[in-house]
């Protein structure tokens, strides 16, 4: 067993060896290294064909038309292109956007930028289980609302939004609907034919593909128009200029094909491991799950261990590669904004750890993790005066702390 044990699959996944092998065939002189936009020779034609195959594979994953797939540098760029693209194209129809407080920073900061440009954004608060009720979204809709952006699976707590229901609502009100599916594409079934979603952001490195490549699904019927944010040679039907990175795209295509083929078996195995982990730690006193356990992705588990400081717990769990919050904001010492939006106080938010399980996690690793967590929590609470006071029945909320 290799240490530290990787339990941070929501931050990134290792490239599947089958994907890496396909990518290697698109790099060197004896491979498919040409520019897909070179139409005058075989090297370009071969690269274009490889890109077309990958585009089909990504489209098949979500049951889309290959012409609806726009390759980008990742889900962050896809989010930017979708939200800014819609806002700038449809601004004469209205300048109101609806999103949630628990979105990824790629959505929140894009909306903040649009606010600086004169758009108005409503940030919806979730219920304590992390989910946003349909009525809340409907109540926020106005005559001038042009876009709703709600994520499919939350990156920190793993809760799954009912995308089909939100899509129905948006379509009935003629409002464009964007979904950040970075955490769900390749892990949960997505069918754009039955879901009334207009734009979907996808990342390759969350589904065992390479970093630096993603896609944006842009619906053709009814047709969604976007204003480009990247200008140049007019690649990707004018929506995203820049030479297509054949090896990255081929990697994403192969990752999508494997994810589609293995989704059911992968998820069954991952769910068993997730349940094993939770059953192994839920007996620890004052341990709470964050987010709706039933309506969440099976590879994600966000747990608060009360009376234990998150940073010291992570240091104690040095044999486990886990995170407190998302990788994109883990450099800050602020408690997770997602957990704060759920109504957790600073202490509980700070004592939370995100465990995310994936394709290469083993039962042996989970058992080692359970043992390590139980021991570490015990050791840290031994040193905690707050834990001692709690054990003695002191109501810590009523304690008047002296200021020095």
Curated annotation (Swiss-Prot):
Annotated positions binding [2Fe-2S] cluster: 328
Claim: Zinc-finger is one of the keywords in the record: no
Cofactor(s) it depends on: pyridoxal 5'-phosphate
InterPro entries: Aminotrans_V_dom, Aminotrans_V_PyrdxlP_BS, Cys_deSase_IscS, Cysteine_dSase, PyrdxlP-dep_Trfase, PyrdxlP-dep_Trfase_major, PyrdxlP-dep_Trfase_small
Listed EC numbers: 2.8.1.7
Gene Ontology cellular component terms for the protein in this record: L-cysteine desulfurase complex
Main location: cytoplasm
EC primary class: transferase
Keyword vocabulary terms for this entry: 2Fe-2S, Cytoplasm, Iron, Iron-sulfur, Metal-binding, Pyridoxal phosphate, Transferase
Active-site positions on this chain: 328 (cysteine persulfide intermediate)
PROSITE patterns given in the database record: AA_TRANSFER_CLASS_5
GO BP, one annotated term: [2Fe-2S] cluster assembly
Superkingdom: Bacteria
Family, as annotated: Belongs to the class-V pyridoxal-phosphate-dependent aminotransferase family. NifS/IscS subfamily.
Function as written in the Swiss-Prot or TrEMBL entry: Master enzyme that delivers sulfur to a number of partners involved in Fe-S cluster assembly, tRNA modification or cofactor biosynthesis. Catalyzes the removal of elemental sulfur atoms from cysteine to produce alanine. Functions as a sulfur delivery protein for Fe-S cluster synthesis onto IscU, an Fe-S scaffold assembly protein, as well as other S acceptor proteins.
Subunit: Homodimer. Forms a heterotetramer with IscU, interacts with other sulfur acceptors.
Protein name (record): Cysteine desulfurase IscS
Native source species: Shewanella sediminis (strain HAW-EB3)
Classification of source organism: Bacteria, Pseudomonadati, Pseudomonadota, Gammaproteobacteria, Alteromonadales
Gene from which this protein is expressed: iscS
């Amino acid at each position: 067993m290799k240490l530290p044990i990787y339990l941070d699959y929501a931050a990134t996944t290792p490239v599947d060896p089958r994907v890496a092998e396909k990518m290697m065939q698109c790099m060197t002189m004896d491979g498919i290294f040409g520019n897909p936009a070179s139409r005058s020779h075989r090297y370009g034609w071969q690269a274009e064909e490889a890109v077309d195959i990958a585009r089909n594979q990504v489209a098949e994953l979500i049951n889309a038309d290959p012409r609806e797939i726009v390759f980008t540098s990742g889900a962050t760029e896809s989010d930017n292109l979708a939200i800014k693209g819609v806002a700038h194209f449809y601004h004469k129809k209205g300048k109101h956007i609806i999103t949630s407080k628990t979105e990824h920073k790629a959505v929140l900061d894009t909306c903040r930028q649009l606010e600086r440009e004169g758009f108005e954004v409503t940030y919806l608060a979730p219920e304590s289980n992390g989910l946003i009720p349909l009525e809340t979204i409907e109540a926020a809709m106005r005559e001038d609302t042009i876009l709703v952006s709600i994520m499919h699976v939350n990156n920190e707590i793993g809760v799954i939004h009912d995308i089909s229901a939100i899509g129905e609502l948006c379509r009935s009100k003629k409002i464009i609907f964007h979904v950040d599916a970075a955490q769900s594409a390749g892990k949960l079934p997505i069918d754009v034919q039955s879901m009334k979603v207009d734009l979907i952001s996808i990342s390759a490195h969350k589904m065992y593909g390479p970093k630096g490549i993603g896609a944006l699904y842009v619906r053709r019927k009814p047709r969604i128009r976007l204003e480009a944010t990247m200008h140049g040679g007019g690649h990707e039907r004018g929506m995203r200029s820049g030479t297509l990175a054949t090896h990255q795209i081929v990697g994403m295509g192969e990752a999508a094909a494997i994810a589609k083929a293995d989704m059911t078996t992968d998820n069954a195995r991952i769910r068993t491991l997730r349940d094993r982990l939770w059953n192994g730690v839920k007996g620890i006193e004052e341990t709470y799950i964050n987010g709706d356990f039933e309506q969440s992705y099976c590879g994600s588990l966000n747990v608060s261990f009360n009376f234990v400081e998150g940073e010291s717990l992570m240091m104690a769990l040095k044999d486990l590669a886990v995170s407190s919050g998302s990788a994109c904001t883990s450099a800050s010492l602020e408690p997770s904004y997602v957990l704060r939006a759920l109504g957790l106080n600073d202490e509980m938010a700070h004592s939370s750890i995100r465990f995310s399980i994936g394709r290469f996690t083993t039962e042996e690793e989970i058992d080692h993790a359970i043992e390590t967590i139980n021991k570490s929590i015990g050791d840290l609470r031994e040193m905690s005066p707050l834990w001692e006071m709690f054990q003695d029945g002191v109501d810590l909320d009523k304690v008047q702390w002296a200021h020095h």
